[in-house]
Amino acid sequence: AASDVYKRQNGMVFVSGQLPIDAATGQMAEGIEGQARQSLENIKHILEEAGLTMGNIVKTTVFLQDMSLFAGMNGVYATYFDGAFPARSAVAVKALPKDALVEIECIAVR
């Protein structure tokens, strides 16, 4: 890949966009709920590697293949935060790598 999975700068951790691919198997999850869950699990593991948790996230950007997928993504997304949601942008894009339905990136603060 042409970028690191995350970069640390001035107490902030910038996590690259995470496709819904299981690192162990290389397989892409099925459906929007499964894909949202896998993208968020990838973020969770990256943050743990950086010594942080999902609670440290201050901003997410969600890229969706189609805005009609928003509700399915949002239902899963809500389960990853204890009511204290980070700021978020959700954007529909023309296409995502590997024909994924969703890609999620974030910024976390120590």
State what each model feature region is.
Residues 34-48:
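Short, well-ordered amphipathic alpha-helical segments that serve as non-catalytic structural scaffolds
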Residues 7-19:
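Short coil-to-beta-strand
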Residues 1-6:
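Short, small-residue-biased leader/transition segments that mark boundaries at the very start
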Residues 19-30:
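Glycine-rich N-terminal loop/short-helix segment of MobA-like nucleotidyltransferase
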Residues 73-103, 107:
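Short, conserved loop-to-beta-strand elements that form functional interface hotspots
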Residues 53-58:
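Short acidic capping loops at alpha-helix termini that bridge into adjacent secondary structure
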